[in-house]
Design a protein with these regions (language model features):
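Ubiquitin-like/PB1-type beta-grasp interaction modules and other compact soluble beta-rich domains
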Residues: 1-101, 120-127
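Auxiliary tRNA-acceptor-end handling modules of aminoacyl-tRNA synthetases
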Residues: 50-71, 92-96, 104-349
Length: 349
C-alpha cells in the first residue's frame, strides 16, 4: 500500500500508510494530545475514525477548543437520545443540535418529561458512557436511509430525508443499538463523554411551526472535565439570581399585559423610581464627560428618513406609516437624522 504525507499541526510532516485514521495517528505519534476528540483535515472538521487517502494537513483538537467542544456537545445529544429510547421505547426522535455551551434534543413523547424522568435519563446516560460503545459512521444513499428509518418507524427522520435532494449522500452514526441521521462529526466512543448535566425540558413545535406536533425539548451541557462543568453550572446559578424576569417580579418593578402587547412593560411606581435613578446616573456621567443632551420628536415625516437613506434599509422593521393630512409620518426609529438637523441649525466655524 502506498504512503501519504500528513502535515500534523505543531509536529510536522510524517509519512503514513494510505487509509490510516487520525485516531491511529493520535495513538502512535508522540506529541499528539491523548485528549483529542476530533480533528480537522485540510481545514474540515472530521471524525477521528475517517480514513486519510491523500496528502493532507491534520489538526487535532480537544474539547477545550470551540470546534472540539461543539463535537462533544453534539455527541452528548446523541447519548441522551439513546438513553431516552432505552427508557421510553415509544419515543420518536427528531433533531438534536448543539448551541453555545449547550445542546438540546426534541422528542415526540406520549407525556412530557418530569424532573424524575430527567434524572433517570441522566443516570442511563452514565450507564451508556460506561459501556464505552464505539461510535461508527456510515454513508448511505437516500433510498437506503429512507428504508432504514422507515423500518424502525422513525417518522421524523423519514420526513427530513424526503425533503432532501434525491442524489443526496447521507451519513448515519451508530452506537450500540442506537442509530441517528447526522452530518457529524462525533467523538470516537461514548466512554469519552463523562462530564454532563441535563438542565431543563420544555415544549417546542416540530420545525418551529405551531401547526405541527408539540415536542418535548430537553437541554443539557457537557464538558471535557468536571471542573469546567461545575464552573458552567455555577455561572448558570448566578445568572438565575440576576434574571430580570425574576428580579422584576420580586421587586415589583414592571409587568406585562396581553392587551398591551409583548415586550411592552408597564412600569410600577417602584419601576419608575428605578428608571429615574438610572436616567439621573446617565445624565451625571454624560455631563462629566462633556456631552450635551438634546431632545427630538417621537414622530417624523417619512421624507427625512428617505433623505437619510434609513427608510430604504429599515422600513421592514419600523412601525407602519401614519397618514397625517396626506403626509406619511413614522415613529422615530433612529436619532441620527434629527441630530444632523440640530447640528446644521447653527453656523459652525
Amino acid at each position: 500500500m502506498s504512503n501519504i504525507l500528513v502535515n500534523i499541526k505543531g509536529i510536522g510532516s510524517q509519512e503514513f500508510s494510505k487509509g490510516v485514521t487520525p485516531l491511529q495517528i493520535m495513538t502512535d505519534t508522540k506529541g499528539v494530545s491523548r485528549d483529542s476528540i476530533t480533528c480537522k483535515v485540510d481545514g474540515v472538521l472530521t471524525d477521528l475514525s475517517a480514513q486519510l487517502l491523500k496528502d493532507c494537513d491534520l489538526q487535532f483538537m480537544d474539547a477545550k477548543s470551540k470546534d472540539g467542544h461543539s463535537v462533544l456537545l453534539h455527541s452528548t445529544a446523541h447519548l441522551m437520545a439513546q438513553a431516552v429510547k432505552r427508557l421510553f421505547p415509544k419515543t420518536k426522535v427528531t433533531i438534536g443540535p448543539y448551541l453555545d455551551n449547550r445542546f438540546y434534543y426534541d422528542f415526540d413523547v406520549e407525556t412530557p418529561f418530569s424532573e424524575e424522568d430527567l434524572a433517570k435519563i441522566e443516570a442511563e446516560m452514565v450507564k451508556i458512557s460506561n459501556e464505552n460503545l464505539e461510535i461508527i459512521h456510515e454513508v448511505k444513499s437516500r433510498d437506503e436511509a429512507l428504508s432504514f428509518f422507515d423500518k424502525i418507524e422513525e417518522d421524523y427522520k423519514v420526513e427530513i430525508i424526503n425533503d432532501l435532494d434525491k442524489d443526496e449522500i447521507l451519513k448515519v452514526y451508530s452506537q450500540g443499538e442506537f442509530t441517528d441521521l447526522c452530518r457529524g462529526p462525533h467523538v470516537p466512543s461514548t466512554g469519552i463523554i463523562k462530564h454532563f448535566k441535563l438542565l431543563s425540558s420544555s415544549a417546542a413545535y416540530w420545525r418551529a411551526d405551531e401547526n405541527n406536533q408539540t415536542l418535548q425539548r430537553v437541554y443539557g451541557t457537557s464538558f471535557q472535565n468536571e471542573k469546567d462543568l461545575k464552573k458552567y453550572l455555577n455561572m448558570l446559578e448566578e445568572q438565575k439570581k440576576r434574571d430580570h424576569r425574576k428580579i422584576g417580579k420580586e421587586l415589583d418593578l414592571y409587568f406585562f399585559d396581553d392587551e398591551v402587547g409583548p415586550g411592552l412593560p408597564l412600569w410600577t411606581p417602584n419601576g419608575a423610581v428605578m428608571i429615574d435613578e438610572l436616567e439621573a446616573l446617565a445624565k451625571e456621567k454624560e455631563t462629566a464627560s462633556g456631552y450635551l443632551r438634546v431632545k427630538t420628536p417621537h414622530l417624523t415625516k417619512g421624507e427625512l428618513y428617505e433623505k437619510s437613506g434609513h427608510l430604504k434599509h429599515y422600513i421592514s422593521s419600523m412601525y407602519p406609516a401614519m397618514d397625517v393630512d396626506g403626509i406619511d409620518y413614522y415613529m422615530k426609529a433612529m436619532n441620527c437624522p434629527h441630530h444632523h438637523k440640530i447640528f446644521a441649525n447653527t453656523p459652525k466655524s
